[in-house]
Amino acid sequence: MQFRILGPPDLFDEERRLRTPLTSPKQNRLLGALLSRPNSLVPREELVRELWAGRAPKQARSALNAHVSGLRKSVATAEGTRGARARLVTGAGGLTLRVSPTDTDGGRFCLAVSRARSRCRTAPEDAYGILREALSLWRGAVLEGVGPHGPLGAVLADRLQDVRRQALELLFDAALSTGRHADVLSELREATVTHPLCERFHDQLMLALCRSGRGGEAIGVYTEARCRLTAAHGHTPLLRARLEQIGAQSPELSAAGARTPAAFPPPRAPARRGEARPHRFMVRHIEREDGPAERSALGFLTDLLSGRELHTGGV
């Protein structure tokens, strides 16, 4: 039986493929509080604060006992009475939930991420598969549907969300190492929206765009993210280094397994008189004293790296 909290909380019987939903939001909060300190006694005072957020009823002890009994009944439905007694242990002044890491979807997720991390450099294909399976455990937000988290639930949710962010970083690294840059573009864009201050996601998106032959869009990611990230962190070393690679057309942008060999195509011969000029990435820098001027991509990069503000025209 598995305690699932990566989404709406429930108890899941893996052999019979049956889920036992908890019967009230208070039970959901209680489960989250106990899983924030697995195999450790959680004092009653903290459980009361978790369930009622400082507005506890007069008979708080009796009300808490009622919710503990309700949770124990739910566990008994999923695992039997003996299992419920072994899981939920009442101690001096508190309650303990006994679980192993594999008894919860959160624990399984963290174990899988740790296993994938050790394989990312030596076996990125394996790491990619492990991370895909691990991320599929998420059915929604942590403890979804319980309303505002109490202090313990909030700590648990923040901890698991941070591991999920790390898992996505590892997944994208594995994807970029195995030629799956085009496959993760939409997920990378979503990650930069969900985590706008995570420089790593923006850097990975720039690399994925370059390897998909969309270097101009990669520069756009830089220009959009630079001010925001600089204001938050003071500097953007990853994005600046990636921009320099684009300007130099570094081999890093076409690593083994990439399906597109370079971020920008090689220069074309000048057009003969009367022929249409080839399409180029052009930038208008309207702050120059000599008026609007069309500039090459490398000139644009020079200004970007020097920190000047630019106004771009259409590509």
What are these regions (language model features)?
Residues 1-3, 66-100, 232-235:
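DNA-binding patch around the recognition helix
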Residues 1-26, 86-94, 264-270, 278, ...:
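Short boundary/linker motifs that mark transitions into or out of structured domains
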Residues 19-51, 71, 200-203:
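Short amphipathic alpha-helical recognition elements used for nucleic-acid or partner binding
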Residues 23-32, 57-79:
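DNA-recognition element of transcription regulators
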Residues 82-120, 161, 243-247:
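A short linear beta-strand->loop->alpha-helix hinge motif most characteristic
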Residues 94, 112-151, 233:
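Short acidic-capped amphipathic helix/loop micro-motif used as an active-site/signal-coupling element
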Residues 149-195:
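Alpha-helical adaptor scaffolds
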